[in-house]
Amino acid sequence: MSSFYHGDALELSIFGQSHSPAIGVTLSGLPAGFSIDMDELGAFLRRRAPGQNAWSTPRKEADLPDFLSGLVGNVTCGAPLCAVIHNTNTRSQDYNNLIDIPRPGHADYTAQVKFGGFQDVAGGGHFSGRLTAPLCIAGGICKQLLHEKGIEVMARIDAIAGIEDTSEFLAPVDRKNFPVTSDESAEHMKAAIARARAEEDSVGGLIRCQITGVPAGLGEPMFGGLENKISQLAFAIPAVKGIEFGLGFAAAGLRGSENNDAYRVEDGRVVTETNHCGGILGGISNGMPIVFRLAVKPTPSIARTQKSVSLSAMQNAELNIHGRHDPCIVPRAVPCVEAAATIAIYDALKASGI
Protein backbone atom coordinates (compact mmCIF):
# COMPACT_ATOMS: atom_id res chain seq x y z
CA MET A 1 0.00 0.00 0.00
CA SER A 2 1.60 3.25 -1.15
CA SER A 3 0.62 6.19 1.04
CA PHE A 4 3.78 8.17 0.35
CA TYR A 5 4.38 11.55 -1.22
CA HIS A 6 7.81 11.71 -2.83
CA GLY A 7 8.28 15.42 -3.37
CA ASP A 8 11.20 17.42 -4.70
CA ALA A 9 12.34 18.40 -1.20
CA LEU A 10 9.85 16.70 1.13
CA GLU A 11 9.07 13.06 1.84
CA LEU A 12 5.67 12.43 3.43
CA SER A 13 4.12 9.20 4.67
CA ILE A 14 0.68 8.69 6.23
CA PHE A 15 0.07 5.54 8.29
CA GLY A 16 -2.64 3.87 10.35
CA GLN A 17 -6.33 3.05 9.99
CA SER A 18 -9.49 4.70 11.22
CA HIS A 19 -9.82 2.29 14.16
CA SER A 20 -6.18 1.28 14.69
CA PRO A 21 -4.56 2.34 18.00
CA ALA A 22 -3.15 5.42 16.28
CA ILE A 23 -2.78 7.21 12.96
CA GLY A 24 0.25 9.26 12.07
CA VAL A 25 2.64 10.97 9.72
CA THR A 26 6.35 11.03 9.00
CA LEU A 27 7.78 14.10 7.29
CA SER A 28 11.36 14.52 6.08
CA GLY A 29 12.91 17.65 4.61
CA LEU A 30 11.90 20.28 7.15
CA PRO A 31 14.57 22.85 7.98
CA ALA A 32 16.32 22.50 11.32
CA GLY A 33 15.78 25.26 13.86
CA PHE A 34 12.15 26.12 13.08
CA SER A 35 9.99 26.70 16.16
CA ILE A 36 6.49 25.25 15.73
CA ASP A 37 3.66 27.21 17.32
CA MET A 38 1.76 24.33 18.93
CA ASP A 39 -1.24 26.48 19.82
CA GLU A 40 -1.62 27.51 16.19
CA LEU A 41 -1.16 23.92 15.02
CA GLY A 42 -3.79 22.75 17.51
CA ALA A 43 -6.26 25.36 16.28
CA PHE A 44 -5.68 24.22 12.70
CA LEU A 45 -6.30 20.57 13.61
CA ARG A 46 -9.49 21.45 15.50
CA ARG A 47 -10.95 22.90 12.31
CA ARG A 48 -10.92 19.34 10.90
CA ALA A 49 -11.72 17.41 14.09
CA PRO A 50 -14.94 15.34 14.26
CA GLY A 51 -17.88 15.55 16.62
CA GLN A 52 -18.04 19.33 17.05
CA ASN A 53 -21.41 20.23 15.50
CA ALA A 54 -24.66 19.04 13.96
CA TRP A 55 -23.23 18.64 10.44
CA SER A 56 -20.36 16.40 11.58
CA THR A 57 -20.07 12.77 12.63
CA PRO A 58 -20.99 12.14 16.30
CA ARG A 59 -17.61 10.42 16.78
CA LYS A 60 -15.54 12.60 19.10
CA GLU A 61 -11.73 12.59 18.98
CA ALA A 62 -9.37 15.07 20.64
CA ASP A 63 -6.91 14.83 17.71
CA LEU A 64 -3.94 15.89 19.83
CA PRO A 65 -0.64 15.16 18.05
CA ASP A 66 2.03 13.25 19.96
CA PHE A 67 5.45 13.98 18.44
CA LEU A 68 7.78 10.98 18.57
CA SER A 69 10.78 12.41 16.71
CA GLY A 70 12.05 15.40 14.79
CA LEU A 71 11.67 17.95 17.59
CA VAL A 72 13.67 19.11 20.57
CA GLY A 73 11.17 21.03 22.60
CA ASN A 74 9.01 22.49 19.86
CA VAL A 75 11.95 23.16 17.53
CA THR A 76 12.77 21.02 14.49
CA CYS A 77 16.13 19.30 14.86
CA GLY A 78 16.74 18.09 11.30
CA ALA A 79 15.70 14.48 11.92
CA PRO A 80 12.57 13.12 10.24
CA LEU A 81 9.49 14.32 12.07
CA CYS A 82 7.06 11.66 13.24
CA ALA A 83 3.76 12.37 14.98
CA VAL A 84 0.80 10.21 15.94
CA ILE A 85 -2.80 10.84 16.95
CA HIS A 86 -4.33 8.18 19.19
CA ASN A 87 -7.76 6.85 18.25
CA THR A 88 -9.85 6.81 21.42
CA ASN A 89 -13.50 6.56 20.31
CA THR A 90 -14.04 3.60 17.99
CA ARG A 91 -16.93 1.16 17.47
CA SER A 92 -15.51 -1.40 15.06
CA GLN A 93 -18.44 -3.82 15.45
CA ASP A 94 -20.59 -1.38 13.47
CA TYR A 95 -18.67 -2.35 10.33
CA ASN A 96 -18.76 -6.17 10.51
CA ASN A 97 -21.29 -6.54 7.68
CA LEU A 98 -19.08 -4.55 5.29
CA ILE A 99 -16.58 -7.41 5.09
CA ASP A 100 -19.06 -9.23 2.87
CA ILE A 101 -21.30 -6.44 1.54
CA PRO A 102 -19.32 -3.41 0.26
CA ARG A 103 -20.64 0.13 0.49
CA PRO A 104 -21.59 1.74 -2.84
CA GLY A 105 -19.43 4.81 -3.40
CA HIS A 106 -16.75 3.73 -0.91
CA ALA A 107 -13.43 1.92 -1.40
CA ASP A 108 -14.66 -1.30 0.29
CA TYR A 109 -14.91 -3.28 -2.96
CA THR A 110 -11.77 -1.97 -4.63
CA ALA A 111 -9.78 -2.60 -1.42
CA GLN A 112 -11.21 -6.14 -1.31
CA VAL A 113 -9.98 -6.80 -4.85
CA LYS A 114 -6.61 -5.14 -4.25
CA PHE A 115 -5.77 -6.75 -0.90
CA GLY A 116 -7.58 -10.06 -1.14
CA GLY A 117 -9.93 -9.57 1.79
CA PHE A 118 -7.21 -8.73 4.32
CA GLN A 119 -8.04 -5.02 4.34
CA ASP A 120 -9.32 -3.34 7.50
CA VAL A 121 -12.93 -2.26 6.91
CA ALA A 122 -13.59 -0.76 10.36
CA GLY A 123 -14.32 2.91 9.91
CA GLY A 124 -13.05 2.67 6.33
CA GLY A 125 -9.62 1.47 7.47
CA HIS A 126 -6.77 3.19 5.65
CA PHE A 127 -9.23 4.70 3.18
CA SER A 128 -11.03 6.71 5.85
CA GLY A 129 -11.23 10.48 5.93
CA ARG A 130 -9.74 10.06 9.41
CA LEU A 131 -6.35 9.81 7.70
CA THR A 132 -6.58 13.49 6.77
CA ALA A 133 -5.80 14.33 10.41
CA PRO A 134 -2.08 13.44 10.04
CA LEU A 135 -2.11 15.18 6.65
CA CYS A 136 -3.20 18.30 8.53
CA ILE A 137 -0.31 17.91 10.98
CA ALA A 138 2.14 18.11 8.08
CA GLY A 139 0.14 20.85 6.38
CA GLY A 140 -0.21 22.87 9.56
CA ILE A 141 3.55 22.92 10.04
CA CYS A 142 4.22 23.84 6.40
CA LYS A 143 1.57 26.55 6.71
CA GLN A 144 3.61 28.21 9.46
CA LEU A 145 6.77 27.93 7.35
CA LEU A 146 5.04 29.59 4.39
CA HIS A 147 3.62 32.34 6.60
CA GLU A 148 7.20 33.36 7.46
CA LYS A 149 7.79 33.86 3.73
CA GLY A 150 4.64 35.94 3.27
CA ILE A 151 2.66 33.17 1.58
CA GLU A 152 -0.87 32.50 2.81
CA VAL A 153 -3.14 29.57 1.93
CA MET A 154 -6.85 30.08 2.57
CA ALA A 155 -9.84 27.94 1.62
CA ARG A 156 -13.59 28.14 2.11
CA ILE A 157 -16.78 26.35 1.19
CA ASP A 158 -17.83 27.47 -2.29
CA ALA A 159 -21.04 25.45 -2.51
CA ILE A 160 -22.97 22.70 -0.74
CA ALA A 161 -25.87 20.82 -2.33
CA GLY A 162 -25.90 23.36 -5.17
CA ILE A 163 -26.17 26.33 -2.78
CA GLU A 164 -23.35 28.74 -3.55
CA ASP A 165 -21.50 31.21 -1.38
CA THR A 166 -22.58 34.62 -2.66
CA SER A 167 -19.13 36.19 -2.39
CA GLU A 168 -16.47 35.74 -5.05
CA PHE A 169 -13.75 36.80 -2.63
CA LEU A 170 -11.93 34.76 -0.02
CA ALA A 171 -12.38 36.75 3.16
CA PRO A 172 -10.75 35.12 6.22
CA VAL A 173 -13.05 32.34 7.43
CA ASP A 174 -10.57 30.14 9.30
CA ARG A 175 -12.05 31.13 12.68
CA LYS A 176 -15.59 30.22 11.61
CA ASN A 177 -16.83 26.72 12.46
CA PHE A 178 -18.69 26.80 9.13
CA PRO A 179 -16.20 28.40 6.72
CA VAL A 180 -18.41 30.38 4.35
CA THR A 181 -18.05 34.09 3.52
CA SER A 182 -21.79 34.81 3.45
CA ASP A 183 -23.67 34.07 6.68
CA GLU A 184 -26.93 33.89 4.73
CA SER A 185 -25.51 31.25 2.38
CA ALA A 186 -24.17 29.35 5.38
CA GLU A 187 -27.63 29.05 6.92
CA HIS A 188 -29.10 27.72 3.66
CA MET A 189 -26.26 25.19 3.39
CA LYS A 190 -26.75 24.02 6.98
CA ALA A 191 -30.46 23.56 6.30
CA ALA A 192 -29.67 21.44 3.24
CA ILE A 193 -27.35 19.26 5.32
CA ALA A 194 -30.01 18.86 8.01
CA ARG A 195 -32.59 17.84 5.39
CA ALA A 196 -30.22 15.26 3.92
CA ARG A 197 -29.52 13.78 7.36
CA ALA A 198 -33.25 13.64 8.17
CA GLU A 199 -33.81 11.82 4.88
CA GLU A 200 -31.01 9.34 5.71
CA ASP A 201 -28.85 10.77 2.94
CA SER A 202 -25.83 13.03 2.42
CA VAL A 203 -24.68 15.96 0.27
CA GLY A 204 -21.43 17.09 -1.33
CA GLY A 205 -20.08 20.42 -2.50
CA LEU A 206 -17.23 22.58 -3.73
CA ILE A 207 -14.24 24.07 -1.93
CA ARG A 208 -12.35 27.11 -3.22
CA CYS A 209 -8.72 27.69 -2.28
CA GLN A 210 -6.53 30.75 -2.85
CA ILE A 211 -2.77 31.04 -2.32
CA THR A 212 -1.30 34.54 -2.15
CA GLY A 213 2.30 35.71 -1.99
CA VAL A 214 3.73 33.04 -4.30
CA PRO A 215 6.53 34.59 -6.39
CA ALA A 216 6.49 34.31 -10.16
CA GLY A 217 8.65 31.52 -11.56
CA LEU A 218 7.83 28.74 -9.09
CA GLY A 219 7.16 25.32 -10.59
CA GLU A 220 8.30 23.28 -13.58
CA PRO A 221 6.87 22.49 -17.02
CA MET A 222 4.99 19.30 -17.80
CA PHE A 223 5.22 16.69 -15.02
CA GLY A 224 6.63 19.04 -12.39
CA GLY A 225 3.98 21.74 -12.75
CA LEU A 226 2.32 23.35 -9.75
CA GLU A 227 -1.08 22.06 -10.90
CA ASN A 228 0.36 18.54 -10.88
CA LYS A 229 1.78 18.87 -7.37
CA ILE A 230 -1.33 20.45 -5.87
CA SER A 231 -3.59 17.90 -7.57
CA GLN A 232 -1.52 14.93 -6.40
CA LEU A 233 -1.81 16.01 -2.78
CA ALA A 234 -5.43 17.14 -3.06
CA PHE A 235 -6.52 13.70 -4.25
CA ALA A 236 -5.11 12.25 -1.03
CA ILE A 237 -8.29 13.64 0.52
CA PRO A 238 -10.64 10.64 0.06
CA ALA A 239 -13.80 12.55 -0.91
CA VAL A 240 -12.19 14.69 -3.64
CA LYS A 241 -13.38 13.80 -7.15
CA GLY A 242 -12.36 16.78 -9.28
CA ILE A 243 -10.20 19.89 -9.45
CA GLU A 244 -10.03 22.99 -11.65
CA PHE A 245 -7.63 25.94 -11.69
CA GLY A 246 -8.83 29.46 -12.43
CA LEU A 247 -11.87 29.30 -14.71
CA GLY A 248 -11.15 25.62 -15.25
CA PHE A 249 -13.82 23.89 -17.31
CA ALA A 250 -15.67 27.15 -17.90
CA ALA A 251 -12.72 28.31 -20.05
CA ALA A 252 -13.66 25.66 -22.61
CA GLY A 253 -16.72 27.72 -23.56
CA LEU A 254 -14.83 30.99 -24.08
CA ARG A 255 -12.89 32.52 -26.94
CA GLY A 256 -9.21 33.21 -26.54
CA SER A 257 -9.89 36.94 -26.42
CA GLU A 258 -12.19 36.33 -23.45
CA ASN A 259 -10.03 33.83 -21.59
CA ASN A 260 -6.60 35.45 -21.98
CA ASP A 261 -5.40 37.47 -18.98
CA ALA A 262 -4.10 40.82 -20.25
CA TYR A 263 -0.78 41.96 -18.76
CA ARG A 264 0.07 45.36 -17.34
CA VAL A 265 2.79 46.91 -15.19
CA GLU A 266 1.73 47.89 -11.67
CA ASP A 267 4.11 49.25 -9.01
CA GLY A 268 7.09 48.02 -10.97
CA ARG A 269 5.89 44.44 -11.44
CA VAL A 270 4.00 42.54 -14.12
CA VAL A 271 0.41 41.68 -13.17
CA THR A 272 -2.66 40.50 -15.05
CA GLU A 273 -5.96 42.36 -15.30
CA THR A 274 -7.91 39.15 -14.73
CA ASN A 275 -6.89 35.79 -13.29
CA HIS A 276 -8.65 33.26 -15.48
CA CYS A 277 -5.56 31.02 -15.48
CA GLY A 278 -5.62 30.77 -11.68
CA GLY A 279 -2.10 32.09 -11.24
CA ILE A 280 -0.35 29.28 -13.13
CA LEU A 281 0.79 29.11 -16.77
CA GLY A 282 2.82 26.22 -18.15
CA GLY A 283 2.97 24.72 -14.67
CA ILE A 284 4.77 27.83 -13.37
CA SER A 285 3.41 30.58 -11.12
CA ASN A 286 2.94 34.02 -12.69
CA GLY A 287 2.85 35.97 -9.42
CA MET A 288 -0.92 36.31 -9.25
CA PRO A 289 -2.95 34.45 -6.59
CA ILE A 290 -3.16 30.72 -7.24
CA VAL A 291 -6.85 29.84 -7.27
CA PHE A 292 -8.44 26.42 -7.61
CA ARG A 293 -11.67 24.61 -6.75
CA LEU A 294 -12.25 21.03 -5.64
CA ALA A 295 -15.34 18.87 -6.04
CA VAL A 296 -16.19 16.86 -2.91
CA LYS A 297 -18.58 13.94 -3.30
CA PRO A 298 -21.47 13.20 -0.90
CA THR A 299 -20.47 10.92 1.97
CA PRO A 300 -21.12 7.35 0.72
CA SER A 301 -22.02 6.00 4.18
CA ILE A 302 -25.72 6.87 4.44
CA ALA A 303 -28.45 5.44 6.66
CA ARG A 304 -30.94 4.49 3.94
CA THR A 305 -30.92 0.96 2.49
CA GLN A 306 -28.73 0.62 -0.62
CA LYS A 307 -28.26 -1.98 -3.33
CA SER A 308 -25.00 -3.91 -3.18
CA VAL A 309 -23.72 -7.51 -3.46
CA SER A 310 -22.71 -10.33 -1.15
CA LEU A 311 -19.13 -11.15 -2.10
CA SER A 312 -19.25 -14.56 -0.40
CA ALA A 313 -22.46 -15.65 -2.13
CA MET A 314 -21.82 -13.66 -5.33
CA GLN A 315 -25.42 -12.50 -5.47
CA ASN A 316 -27.26 -9.22 -5.15
CA ALA A 317 -27.89 -7.97 -1.63
CA GLU A 318 -29.18 -4.98 0.30
CA LEU A 319 -26.95 -3.02 2.64
CA ASN A 320 -27.86 -1.20 5.83
CA ILE A 321 -24.93 0.84 7.13
CA HIS A 322 -24.37 1.31 10.83
CA GLY A 323 -21.77 3.49 12.52
CA ARG A 324 -21.32 7.25 12.81
CA HIS A 325 -20.86 9.30 9.66
CA ASP A 326 -20.89 12.89 8.37
CA PRO A 327 -23.99 13.93 6.40
CA CYS A 328 -21.62 16.35 4.63
CA ILE A 329 -17.83 16.20 4.78
CA VAL A 330 -17.26 19.52 3.00
CA PRO A 331 -16.86 21.79 6.08
CA ARG A 332 -14.27 19.50 7.67
CA ALA A 333 -12.45 19.06 4.35
CA VAL A 334 -11.65 22.79 4.05
CA PRO A 335 -8.52 22.70 6.28
CA CYS A 336 -7.49 19.45 4.56
CA VAL A 337 -7.46 21.29 1.23
CA GLU A 338 -5.33 24.02 2.80
CA ALA A 339 -2.97 21.35 4.14
CA ALA A 340 -2.57 19.67 0.75
CA ALA A 341 -1.96 22.96 -1.06
CA THR A 342 0.45 24.16 1.61
CA ILE A 343 2.59 21.03 1.42
CA ALA A 344 2.72 21.28 -2.38
CA ILE A 345 3.77 24.93 -2.39
CA TYR A 346 6.31 24.56 0.40
CA ASP A 347 7.84 21.52 -1.31
CA ALA A 348 8.21 23.43 -4.59
CA LEU A 349 9.53 26.52 -2.82
CA LYS A 350 12.14 24.61 -0.81
CA ALA A 351 13.30 22.68 -3.86
CA SER A 352 13.66 25.88 -5.88
CA GLY A 353 15.90 27.56 -3.34
CA ILE A 354 13.78 30.73 -3.48
Q: How would you name each of these model-derived features?
A:
Residues 11-16, 119-131, 216-220, 275-281, ...:
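A short glycine/serine-rich beta->alpha loop
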Residues 1-59:
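N-terminal, positively charged regions that mediate nucleic acid binding
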Residues 44-104, 108-110:
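Glycine-rich, N-terminal phosphate-binding loop and its surrounding beta-alpha-beta segment
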Residues 21-33, 129-151, 224, 228, ...:
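Alpha-helical support elements that line or immediately flank enzyme active sites
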